[in-house]
């Protein structure tokens, strides 16, 4: 996620499939949704299935808990291409995750997949499709 977009962009929209594997569960949890980013500080992460839920950060306003808000802000910093914020976001990600692996598309501008490995070994794989940037 920390290298979601290399070039500075004004907006980004994408569909996603998120697969969460938790050691205590036999089957992974699969969710689908849509994400929207608008510069400089708006992010919406909307789950469509299996349960509808929307996480949103708009400037200083947010409808999510502080940990989710930090995660969304890390994504926004990566999308915005803000060097100083990227360094801060990377430091913050080390507190939350054991590793963050990003697979870029052929252009090298947009992430196709992001794999997050939490400190406890649980993993989250996010695959992006239908990406539109401005």
Model regions and ranges:
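N-terminal secretory signal peptides
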Residues: 11-46, 51-59, 101, 115-116
């Amino acid at each position: 996620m920390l290298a979601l977009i290399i070039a500075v962009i004004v907006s980004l929209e994408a569909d996603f499939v998120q697969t969460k594997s938790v050691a205590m569960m036999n089957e992974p949890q699969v969710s689908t949704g849509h994400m929207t980013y608008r510069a400089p500080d708006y992010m919406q992460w909307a789950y469509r299935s299996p349960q509808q839920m929307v996480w949103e950060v708009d400037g200083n306003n947010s409808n999510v808990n502080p940990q989710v808000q930090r995660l969304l802000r890390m994504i926004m910093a990566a999308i915005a291409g803000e060097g100083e914020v990227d360094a801060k976001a990377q430091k913050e990600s080390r507190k939350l995750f054991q590793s963050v692996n990003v697979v870029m598309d052929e252009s090298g501008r947009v992430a196709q997949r992001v794999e997050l490995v939490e400190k406890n070994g649980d993993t989250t794989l996010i695959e992006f499709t239908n990406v539109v940037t401005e």
